[in-house]
Amino acid sequence: MTEYCAENYTLQLGYHIVALITILAGGTGSVKLIRGLASQTRELTVISNIGDNIWLHGLYVCPDIDTVIYGLADILDKSQGWGIRNDSFGFIRQMEMLGEQTWFRLGDRDLATHLLRTNMLKNGKNLSEITDWMRNKYAISTKIIPATDNPVETKIITDVGELHIQEFWVKFRGEPKVTDIVYAGAERSRVNPDAIHALKRSKVIIIAPANPVTSIGPILAIKGIRKELILERKKIIAVSPLIGERAISGPAVKYMRALKIQNSPLGVAEYYSDFVGTFIISRTDRNLAAKISRFNIKVYETDITMDDSKDESRLASYLLKQSKSF
């Protein structure tokens, strides 16, 4: 067992870690690493993407927040990366019979989450309070913080018009040509003060291997977050969401091209270069290490795939090991 002690925290690799760790995360591409970190540390905070939140059937749905909650509660449908395992779909079938649009499949058990959230919003609770209530209901020790309590929606500008990210990816199957991406409401939003507090007090800040444009991008668009990350640059580790030109999860490549971000780990590193001090890439991308280091970023190579719980814990341990120098 490797042990590292500094100031008021301890890293004990291969065992439970007592540390102040914050991760910026989306959903499907992030929850694996979040699970791995949660298996290693007793003090983990997730700053969650809110850009894919959407109103459907009169209910407020927060796909990334819910994926993190379900993943940590061990009820996530891992085969599809979202929703609740073995859920039923009677509600959706009934809505379809009644002629309603059912392109976004809400499971019956999943529906309870959205119904309760919506009722609590109507009764004056904010998204942070509701999310904290839910994670406590599932006995989750990891803190989950929405980047803001204000409405922010990622909009995909396409050749068929402006689409909410869920419409683009689910309803239209990601087929329209993408010309731009905007974070509607971000300029008017107020950063969650708990998110800033978590960034300031953490010894390690991790950027999950999530879509840099539509999962991490909306978080960065919230006023104050990117500024704080720049101040904390030395303690920030990002994991590449790409291996070569292939996204580990989801349609990152299409979004990156729309914003003219190079389709490679090098492109992601450049996109993050003002606030990331350490970048983790796949061993198969070692030829990019020297170019990435020109951004004054430390580069490490390892296996960044996560196919099972052992992989999740392995990568989490590796990241924490690299943080020894912070």
PLM region spans:
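Electropositive, gly/pro-rich neighborhoods at or near active sites that engage anionic ligands
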Residues: 49-183
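Short, flexible loop segments at boundaries between secondary-structure elements
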Residues: 233-249, 304-307
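Extreme N-terminal starter segment of soluble prokaryotic enzymes
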Residues: 18-22
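A short helix->loop->beta-strand "cap" motif at the edges of active sites that frequently abuts
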Residues: 42, 232-236, 297
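Charged helix-capping and loop-helix junction motifs
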Residues: 218-226
